[in-house]
A protein has these predicted regions:
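N-terminal structural segment of carbohydrate-active enzymes
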Residues: 2-124
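Formylglycine-dependent
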Residues: 3-9, 80, 173-225
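The substrate-binding groove and active-site-proximal loops of carbohydrate-active enzymes
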Residues: 13-21, 81-98, 128-144, 202-218, ...
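Alpha-helical packing segments of well-folded alpha/beta enzyme cores
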Residues: 38, 98-105, 109-110, 145, ...
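Aromatic- and acidic-residue-enriched segments that line the glycan-binding/catalytic groove
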Residues: 48, 52-68, 125-141, 166-204
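Aromatic-lined substrate-binding rim segments of carbohydrate-active enzymes
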Residues: 107, 121-159
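Structural detector of well-ordered beta-strand residues that form the stable sheet scaffold
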Residues: 161-163
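Residue-level detector of conserved catalytic or cofactor/ligand-binding positions
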Residues: 226-238
Length: 238
């Protein structure tokens, strides 16, 4: 992906569009019919963290010394400096993943839409991406999870959504820098743990340190996952 060209395209679309980068403007955007009218949807929270099968914040908490996750990790996998969260990726094989069977089950349950987590706070993308090699198409299962589900959802007449939790990656692995672990400086854009900033007690719009322009630009570019739907439908829930 040509990052600069894609950013220019985003700016051009924004300039020509009816919405502006303000809460007042964005609040006028109507809720999509598929989300407003459908009675039941299935939300899927699944990823590399499913390998240790502890919970979805395992990647953060295993780097907090004294936490139950840290103790569990050391007991079962060793010290984080020797076996970090990224080392679970080769074990995320998804041998039994059958998107057709999944969608059939969801449809039989009465669901009309499916919303998987396309990227969790841990930074691993469950879709093919040109922005990072840390994605399911290139590592782990070597499958485009979102793309595979999209094909089957469209075939069944269902809408597929995408939930992106990338913004919290800013600090999600930051505790790993507090002791000798596999998360250490220097880190750069494209590295798995980057930027691993210190976590503050209050995560709000005014928390310091604020995300850098480099991080926010990368976050914006990752919303390009909306294009995996072309020419079909993908509902974006970020």
């Amino acid at each position: 992906m040509n990052r600069e060209r894609y950013l220019q395209e985003i700016d051009a679309v924004n300039a020509a569009g009816k919405y502006h980068p303000t809460w007042e403007s964005l609040s006028t955007h109507p809720v999509p019919d598929w989300y407003r009218e459908k009675r039941l949807g299935i939300f899927l929270h699944w990823g590399v963290f499913s390998v240790p099968a502890y919970h979805d914040w395992y990647a953060r908490n295993m780097y907090i010394k004294g936490s139950p996750e840290y103790e569990y990790h050391c007991q079962h996998y060793g010290q984080p400096k020797d076996f970090g969260f990224k080392d679970f990726i080769p074990q995320f094989k998804m041998e039994a993943f059958d998107p057709q069977a999944w969608v059939k089950l969801f449809r039989e349950a009465g669901a009309d839409y499916i919303v998987p987590v396309a990227e969790h706070h841990d930074g691993f993308q469950n879709y093919r991406s040109e922005l990072s090699h840390w994605n399911a198409a290139e590592m782990g299962p070597h499958r485009d999870i979102m793309g595979d589900l999209l094909v089957e959802a469209e075939r069944a007449g269902m809408t597929l959504g995408a939930s992106s939790h990338r913004v919290e990656h800013w600090w999600f692995l930051g505790h790993g820098q507090e002791f000798d672990s596999d998360i250490k400086q220097p880190m750069h854009l494209g590295d798995y743990a980057w930027p691993a900033m210190p976590e503050r007690e209050n995560q709000d719009l005014f928390s310091e340190p604020m995300p850098t322009d480099e991080f926010l630009t990368d976050w914006l570019l990752r919303l390009s996952l909306i294009h995996i739907s072309e020419p079909t439908r993908l509902g974006m829930i970020s």
